[in-house]
Amino acid sequence: MISSSKLKSVDFYRKIPRDLTEASLSGAGLSIVAALAMVFLFGMELSNYLAVNTSTSVIVDRSSDGEFLRIDFNLSFPALSCEFASVDVSDVLGTNRLNITKTVRKYSIDRNLVPTGSEFHPGPIPTVSKHGDDVEENHDDGSVPLSSRNFDSYSHQYPVLVVNFYAPWCYWSNRLKPSWEKTAKIMRERYDPEMDGRIILAKVDCTEEIDLCRRHHIQGYPSIRIFRKGSDLKENQGHHDHESYYGDRDTESLVAAMETYVANIPKDAHVLALEDKSNKTVDPAKRPAPLTSGCRIEGFVRVKKVPGSVVISARSGSHSFDPSQINVSHYVTQFSFGKRLSAKMFNELKRLTPYVGGHHDRLAGQSYIVKHGDVNANVTIEHYLQIVKTELVTLRSSKELKLVEEYEYTAHSSLVHSFYVPVVKFHFEPSPMQVLVTELPKSFSHFITNVCAIIGGVFTVAGILDSIFHNTLRLVKKVELGKNI
């Protein structure tokens, strides 16, 4: 068995009796300075160990979501009706998707962006296959021409007033005209305005009655509206819509539709309507249509990772639009690319790279307003977006790799005057390259080694300085004593 005396012989730290040591003020001061230096350097080393150290490189895009890219958006149009608002997607490969509805929701709003009801559900609008009679015949005007002066009186005089808002330059309006006039004559013969008066057909020339058409928010021609007791508003689950006709436009189809409108109306309703006309009190539930009608469009679309565009416009396969009356001013609440990041993932992103994330939703909060007028008519608003993907690879306590993918983009917008119907275009161009940010792990053993080096180094340097200072003072004293002798 090894004796204790032999173990003591390998002691690196032999003790000197305290009685044989001497303390000094200079040594005490230097010890305090050394202790403070140790604490300061230890804090700096600990901060450096806890800090994130990353490396950044640019590589070819290696997205985990394949060749498709998700676009989330929330846009508010104070002057574009949900009735005709359409979301279209196209790209350079020839993809052309029109009027996307599966992943898009629409909400009617007023000019102040306040919702006026629940989600807009236009219902199944049939495809108009008959835009008029096959054989065009010359018919005398059977419908009543209306203007701003007599519109209100007619709408309150008859239980049902069906109005064709048209434009003489519109191809579809001209196709409808013969069958509309013929239908109006047939309904006059069946329901004489003087004797029966349950229904009457009328027309409004929107090129002459601009304010009247704007008051009823007519954006497409022809628009056939049904007015009951002075209003064309109908309530559907708390949502107010304009009651419109979307069916075929030949005489037979029009007459059949008109018959359904008067089927449940008693014959003496015309007299009751006249009595209601004399009563100046207005039913609050039958308020007139708002001066403007807007639409909030939100949802997402999936596009290929090639240059393309998302277009929002007024679209219909059986209506024409006056470009000077279409205003695509809009507010951007959200327009972002890629999957939505959770709060936890976003904090992880900011921890690794504080400068990333500021352009994830670059257009959010921006507004693009075009004032209505001749000078600002036919204005298309275009946004050019260049997208760059950032991928972060991080090692945490779970010892598992986590991939955080985030898309950022730059945006340049412009207002373009055109002869065509104004639209909003979001041109996007994904970059074939991506930024790869990798967190570099730090060794705990390296941290301990540095801490030991700091403590030992400061202690050793302080000891050397104290020895030099002490020996210098002793030498000076010897010299002074030698001079006095």
Curated annotation (Swiss-Prot):
Keyword Membrane applies: yes
A biological process from GO: intracellular transport
Keywords assigned: Membrane, Signal, Transmembrane, Transmembrane helix
UniProt membrane topology term: Single-pass membrane protein
InterPro entries: Erv, Erv_C, Erv_N, Thioredoxin-like_sf, Thioredoxin_domain
Domain Thioredoxin: 114-263
Compartments in which it is found: Membrane
Any single Pfam family the record assigns to this protein: Thioredoxin
Entry GO terms, CC: COPII-coated ER to Golgi transport vesicle; endoplasmic reticulum; membrane
Active site per the UniProt annotation: C170
Membrane-spanning residues: 444-464
UniProt-listed CDD domains: PDI_a_family (cd02961)
Superkingdom, natural source: Eukaryota
PANTHER family referenced in this protein's UniProt entry, alphabetically: ENDOPLASMIC RETICULUM-GOLGI INTERMEDIATE COMPARTMENT PROTEIN, PROTEIN DISULFIDE-ISOMERASE 5-3
Function (record text): Acts as a protein-folding catalyst that interacts with nascent polypeptides to catalyze the formation, isomerization, and reduction or oxidation of disulfide bonds. May play a role in storage protein biogenesis.
Family: Belongs to the protein disulfide isomerase family.
Official protein name in the record: Protein disulfide isomerase-like 5-4
